[in-house]
Amino acid sequence: MRKVLLDLIKKTGRYFFKLAMKNYVIFKPVLGFVNLETRSRFKMWVLRLAFKALYFRKPNFIFDMNLEKGITLVGYPYAAIGEGEFLRQTARVFLKSNINFGIHNFNFGMQSSENNKSLASFIRSDNPHLINLFHLKPDQFEAFVVSLGNSFVKGRYNIGYWVWELGDLPEAWISPIKYFHEIWCPSRFIQSAVSKFVAEPAIYMPPALEVEDSKGFDRSYFKLPKDRFLFFFIFDFKSSFFRKNPMGCVRAFQEAFHKSDKSVGLVLKSIGGDQYPNEFSKLNEAIRADSRINFIDAIYSPEEIVGLMSVCDSFVSLHRSEGIGLSIAQSMLLGKPVIATGYSGNIDFTRSDNSCLVDYKLIEVGEGE
């Protein structure tokens, strides 16, 4: 009787959870007076409570051998963010290696554009495979399990493969991390952070990266000057304005080149500025008086992003911390000289012999950063 009642509670909870997520846009005006950070914290608190009370279970090694030998990738295959590209690169490796796989699109709370449909034919709602590979952070994994229940993971070998950008893990992640049989770490920096907090195997698994030189784009397409040496930086406001540090790029550019020097320019490409009006306004104010700086806050196709990288001359990332640094790596693959902070995930591939590394001094992460 207790089991039947518990299953009923779970089923009812999942129904209302999915209903709330499906109609989230309806509730946004009502929640407008509550800032984004407070809403996010409340949402995660509710999820964590439900996860611990109803769904948490340590992984065992009893597997359903009637399942297909293959892998189900879980994450954001359509999203125009680093996590989306990370999953897509993994899927391309499986394709080239003839590995049987499918993709489950989990767009819980997705606030970024979902315009990359390159893997749409591999999307499926069921899960016939023995192995799950989660391109989801532990808090996102909690939302996934609460939304779909334990059936998606039961009897399967569950691997976590996510990006994290700081040297320590959030304490709230420790419980859901224990759900995985093993964890893959795409950089030594992430491996070091994970290994300090968990007993599960933390395996260094660098991502496969490739980028095709996008043809058909020139500077006129992006309304950029033809006769200047252009430095380039790209970021998502949602990925932490302070961590990505575009203001550092602006300051460094203006200190390095006098305002009368018209032989150089800086291109800043972002998405999500409308969701972070304070940071958006701060950046606009910093560049307002400098006509050499082009600021583009818009959704581009994957081809346009590569095209924009291609027509610029050098990539600059004065980040405070990166889990991997996908944009840095993509620029290097395009043959662009890179200037980057000599710290965090990117030092796996940015070295003193192939990049211009910038010295740094570690500071405490401030509240709200």
Model regions: which residues?
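N-terminal pre-catalytic "stem/leader" segment of glycosyltransferase-like enzymes
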Residues: 2-136
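Nucleotide-sugar donor-binding and catalytic loop/hinge architecture
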Residues: 60-69, 121-125, 215-231, 258-261
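Nucleotide-activated donor-binding/catalytic signature segment of Leloir-type glycosyltransferases, i.e.
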Residues: 278-306
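Short alpha-helical donor nucleotide-sugar binding micro-motif in glycosyltransferases
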Residues: 306-312
